[in-house]
């Protein structure tokens, strides 16, 4: 992407694998990357040159596959435009910081990453359910970053997006399942 000047943010599993004590503790079934929709033709060209097949696009994702098992989801937006959280998450490419060693690859703040992870997981929960890995991801992320998170910002954003209660429940479940007795992380 750097060579083709495609601004991007790797999402979810790409960074979560690095949060675990060993990367093989966290599986990924596809790679999700946020990009600027205006660069869709360049993205298609790059993946074609790398041997990927363009499968389809929907209102916010472009899907690519390379057999036998590599799947890429290029996200033009973090959430669908009709979702309540869209206005709060739409400018993530502009809000993120450049990753070390890259000219066009960025990363979200820890707070925005956690918020996006929760929004993504809550959509799965609402549509069809979520598994233990999503709860474990929350636990691992919070354990790794609890001392550096801006909880005032998180509380405000979680309320605005409408997932504050959801976040609290997921956090309670995560710490009940995966921590020593009585360990708890509070946001207040």
Region locations from a protein language model:
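Conserved NTP-donor binding/palm subdomain of two-metal-ion nucleotidyltransferases/polymerases, i.e.
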Residues: 1-29, 35-188
